[in-house]
């Protein structure tokens, strides 16, 4: 049985669930799930856990995510991207300088309370926000606490003198639950003009990046050589200190027992026969199991 993480390079025009469905069919596997939904028109890194790795999904969500994208000043939509209905337009007669845009981005960096777009999957009273929007039902959107670690302008903005709009490229590193579309919209609000996100690519998630991402077509063509496209469970815990278990220790760990270890780390990955078999956390003078991965081979 396959165990690990497939870093899928999701194309534009398909949902994250579509990718999981297709990969399930390709691999003929039941235990499968993704970590971090991408909107249909967003491409890039979509980590999909299979087998024992599905135990990691909650932890995978906790790691930062990175994006590159583009936006435009002069237009705003109800969805904050090009899929939505235009709700505001304004000619940009005097384009913003790089320094002005950077100053706006800096105000949107750090710990923020963010209002999600009305066209999003956030639930309010058991119903998704986009369902309220489609039915024209007013709803108060709940603020969410997010952390924007960095929001950077990646090159000088470009001004279109005919359309009187200004385009800009950005890079963002943020916590889970952050809506990048909202950050583009909010940047426009900081500068006093309408703004819309025009493209977005996720470049990293759950500790994996685009260099490790593969197309579903490649997986299907190379299904007999999983070493080319499957990230082992151990790779997810690369930052954790690892301890080798003796046969006697492994027997105790296999039974979920607490054990004494000759280390002082708060959390450790326990290795046996070359694979991580459990994650243990220190409590006082002993270590107790936090996650069991006994079938990780």
Curated annotation (Swiss-Prot):
The kind of enzyme this is, by top-level EC class, is: isomerase
Q: Which family does it belong to?
A: Belongs to the pseudouridine synthase TruB family. Type 1 subfamily.
The record's listing under InterPro entries reads:
PsdUridine_synth_cat_dom_sf, PsdUridine_synth_N, tRNA_psdUridine_synth_TruB, TruB_C
Q: Which UniProt keywords apply?
A: Isomerase, tRNA processing
Q: Where is the active site?
A: 39 (nucleophile)
The family database entries (Gene3D superfamilies) matched by this protein are listed as: Pseudouridine synthase
Q: What is this protein called?
A: tRNA pseudouridine synthase B
């Amino acid at each position: 049985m396959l165990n690990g993480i497939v870093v899928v390079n999701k194309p534009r025009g398909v949902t994250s669930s579509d990718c999981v469905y297709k990969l399930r069919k390709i691999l003929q596997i039941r235990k499968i799930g993704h970590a971090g939904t991408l909107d249909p028109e967003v491409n890039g890194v979509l980590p999909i856990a299979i087998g024992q790795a599905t135990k990691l999904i909650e932890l995978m969500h906790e790691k930062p995510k990175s994006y590159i994208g583009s936006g435009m000043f002069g237009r705003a939509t109800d969805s904050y991207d090009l899929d939505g209905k235009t709700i505001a337009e304004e000619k940009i007669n005097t384009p913003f300088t790089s320094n002005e845009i950077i100053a706006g981005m800096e105000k949107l960096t750090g710990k923020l309370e963010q209002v999600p777009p009305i066209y999003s999957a956030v639930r309010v009273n058991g119903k998704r926000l986009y369902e309220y929007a489609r039915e024209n039902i007013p709803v108060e959107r709940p603020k969410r606490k997010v952390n924007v670690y960095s929001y950077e302008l990646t090159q000088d903005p470009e001004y279109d003198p005919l359309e009187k709009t200004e385009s800009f490229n950005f890079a963002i590193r943020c916590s889970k639950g952050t809506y990048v579309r909202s950050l583009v919209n909010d940047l426009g609000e900081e500068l006093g003009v309408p703004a819309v996100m025009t493209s977005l690519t996720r470049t990293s998630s759950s500790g994996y990046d685009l260099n490790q991402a593969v197309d579903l077509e490649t997986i299907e063509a190379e299904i007999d050589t999983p070493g080319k496209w499957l990230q082992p469970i151990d790779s997810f815990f690369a930052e954790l200190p690892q301890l080798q278990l003796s046969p006697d220790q492994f027997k105790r760990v296999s039974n979920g027992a607490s054990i004494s270890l000759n280390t002082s780390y708060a959390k450790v990955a326990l290795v046996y026969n070359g694979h991580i078999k459990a994650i243990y956390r220190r409590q006082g003078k002993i270590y107790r199991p936090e996650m069991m991965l006994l079938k990780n081979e």
